[in-house]
UniProtKB/Swiss-Prot annotation:
Co-purifies with latroinsectotoxin. One of its GO terms (cellular component) is extracellular region. Expressed by the venom gland. Its main location: secreted. Disulfide bonds join C30-C66, C46-C62, C49-C75. The N-terminus is blocked. It comes from Latrodectus tredecimguttatus (Mediterranean black widow spider). Residues 1-19 form the signal peptide. It comes from the Eukaryota. This is Alpha-latrotoxin-associated low molecular weight protein-2. Keywords: Disulfide bond, Pyrrolidone carboxylic acid, Secreted, Signal. The lineage of its organism: Eukaryota, Metazoa, Ecdysozoa, Arthropoda, Chelicerata. The modification Pyrrolidone carboxylic acid is found at Q20. GO terms for molecular function: neuropeptide hormone activity.
Length: 88
């Protein structure tokens, strides 16, 4: 019985770890065949944008319609400008 519990635990942990490098395209309004690398990159842009603006709604607006809204474009622009600014 202990072996069965250990195996179930390992399977659960491995499943959680393996899923960290992929995202569900439907969560972003994307087609199922969307490139995972692009999805991860765009998701990271939205997370950075949310952190930059310190507003939780930014992430939701940024990722809407598979990153095709003006909010996403503004995030890309804002992050580029933030990189150009000298650190305080």
């Amino acid at each position: 019985m202990l072996k069965l519990i250990c195996i179930a635990f390992l399977v659960t942990v491995l499943t959680l770890v393996a899923g960290q490098d992929s995202l569900d395209p439907a969560e972003f309004g994307c087609a199922d065949d969307v490139n995972q690398a692009e999805l991860l990159k765009n998701n990271d842009i939205c997370l950075q944008c949310e952190d930059l603006h310190k507003e939780g709604v930014v992430f939701s607006l940024c990722k809407t319609n598979c990153f095709t809204t003006e909010y996403f474009q503004h995030c890309v622009k804002d992050l580029e400008e933030a990189k150009k600014e000298p650190p305080e």
